[in-house]
Structure formats: structure tokens, C-alpha cells
């Protein structure tokens, strides 16, 4: 049984506190899946057509990859394309990333400062992935503490890609699918 205790917006997402009456092993499985197996979007492929800034292409691509992208992937091969074209002097922010099929979770993340005459022109693609592959796909941090026998209190902090309840629901679905798959494999062994 899940009891929601608190939910509040923060500057980087949400804080979500709930208690769960379940064995510790089950609670830990949910926590691990929330962090490492719930799919989210992150910028993976960056095409730099022009970069006369003082930042190396590789660092610029890395910074773009760490910007949280809103949305829950519906298809495995779904792609969100962003473009960025800016000329200095200015600071380039995540809000400068333009897309017809997606959006960044936070508009105020600085990417690079451009001096007079400096320019960047970039196209990048956000694809679905999981935190087990790279931390840029982690939708949250999750910890818990035991408050009674077979009862824990979770503290979940999201990064803006998805709502906390949505992350929890996805984690439960993933765990259910894993359990069903395991049972099917056991049945095949018994035959």
C-alpha cells in the first residue's frame, strides 16, 4: 500500500515523499528501477555546423546532453530534434534550443557565453534511454528509510523530465514485466 505524504515543486523538478508497505527487497527493486530503468529523453547526437566560441565541440556536446528534456518516450526509436543558432555577444541558454516536437525541462540553463563575433549553429537529437546506460537518462534520485517492519518511506527528487508519480508508475510496470518474464522462464524449465 502506498501513502503519499508530500509533493512539492522545486527549482529543479519535484520532491515526492511516500510510504510503502512492502518487504525491503521489493522497495529496493522499485528504487533501483526508478533511477536506472525508467526511460527518458536526453540529447545524444550533436551536429555542430559552426562553433567559434571558446568552448570545445566535445564540451559543448556534453553540456547539451545533460539538459533535461521533458516527456516520456512512447516508442523506442522516437527522436526529438533541436536546433540552436546564436551569435554573440550573449549567453546561450537552454531556452535557445528550438524544437517542433519537444521541449527542455528548464529554460534557464546556461550553455555557453559567446563573445562579439562568435557564433554557434547546432542541430541535436534527443533519444530515449535509461540511466543504467548513462546518468543523463536518470529521471530522479530516490532513497528510502525503514520506518517499521515491512514499511519504508521514500524520498524522490525528479529532474524535470517526468512527474514523480509517473516515474513510480513506470517503475512498477517495469518490475511487473520483469516478474512476469521470470515466471514464464520458470514455466518453460518445468516443462
UniProtKB/Swiss-Prot annotation:
A Gene Ontology molecular function term of the record: DNA-directed RNA polymerase activity
EC annotation from Swiss-Prot or TrEMBL: 2.7.7.6
InterPro entries: DNA-dir_RNA_pol_30-40kDasu_CS, DNA-dir_RNA_pol_insert, DNA-dir_RNA_pol_RpoA/D/Rpb3, RBP11-like, RNAP_Rpo3/Rpb3/RPAC1, RNApol_insert_sf, Rpo3/RPB3_RNA_Pol_subunit
EC primary class: transferase
Catalytic activity as recorded in UniProt: RNA(n) + a ribonucleoside 5'-triphosphate = RNA(n+1) + diphosphate
Major subcellular site: cytoplasm
Pfam family, one: RNA_pol_A_bac
Domain of life: Archaea
GO cellular component: cytoplasm; DNA-directed RNA polymerase complex
SUPFAM superfamilies in alphabetical order: Insert subdomain of RNA polymerase alpha subunit (SSF56553), RBP11-like subunits of RNA polymerase (SSF55257)
GO BP term, pick one: DNA-templated transcription
Keywords: Cytoplasm, DNA-directed RNA polymerase, Nucleotidyltransferase, Transcription, Transferase
Keyword Cytoplasm in record: yes
HAMAP family: RNApol_arch_Rpo3
Family designation: Belongs to the archaeal Rpo3/eukaryotic RPB3 RNA polymerase subunit family.
SUBUNIT field: Part of the RNA polymerase complex. Interacts with Rpo12. Forms an Rpo3-Rpo10-Rpo11-Rpo12 complex upon coexpression.
PANTHER family named among the record's database cross-references: DNA-DIRECTED RNA POLYMERASE, DNA-DIRECTED RNA POLYMERASE II SUBUNIT RPB3
Function (record text): DNA-dependent RNA polymerase (RNAP) catalyzes the transcription of DNA into RNA using the four ribonucleoside triphosphates as substrates.
Protein's name according to its UniProt entry: DNA-directed RNA polymerase subunit Rpo3
Organism encoding this protein: Methanocaldococcus jannaschii (strain ATCC 43067 / DSM 2661 / JAL-1 / JCM 10045 / NBRC 100440)
Amino acid at each position: 500500500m502506498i501513502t503519499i505524504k508530500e509533493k512539492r515543486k522545486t527549482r529543479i523538478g519535484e520532491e515526492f515523499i511516500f510510504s510503502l508497505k512492502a518487504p525491503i527487497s521489493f522497495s529496493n527493486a522499485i528504487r533501483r528501477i526508478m533511477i536506472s530503468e525508467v526511460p527518458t529523453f536526453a540529447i545524444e547526437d550533436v551536429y555542430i555546423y559552426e562553433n567559434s566560441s571558446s568552448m570545445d565541440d566535445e564540451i559543448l556536446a556534453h553540456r547539451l546532453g545533460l539538459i533535461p528534456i521533458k516527456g516520456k518516450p512512447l516508442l523506442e526509436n522516437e527522436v526529438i530534434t533541436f536546433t540552436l543558432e546564436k551569435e554573440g555577444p550573449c549567453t546561450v541558454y537552454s531556452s535557445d534550443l528550438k524544437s517542433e516536437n519537444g521541449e527542455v525541462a528548464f529554460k534557464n540553463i546556461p550553455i555557453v557565453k559567446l563573445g562579439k563575433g562568435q557564433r554557434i549553429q547546432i542541430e541535436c537529437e534527443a533519444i530515449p534511454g535509461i540511466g543504467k546506460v548513462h546518468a543523463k537518462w536518470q529521471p530522479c534520485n530516490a532513497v528510502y528509510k525503514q520506518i517499521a517492519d515491512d514499511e519504508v518511506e521514500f524520498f524522490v527528487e525528479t529532474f524535470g523530465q517526468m512527474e514523480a508519480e509517473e516515474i513510480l508508475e513506470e517503475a512498477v510496470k517495469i518490475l511487473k514485466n520483469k516478474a512476469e518474464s521470470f515466471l514464464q522462464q520458470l514455466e518453460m524449465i518445468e516443462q
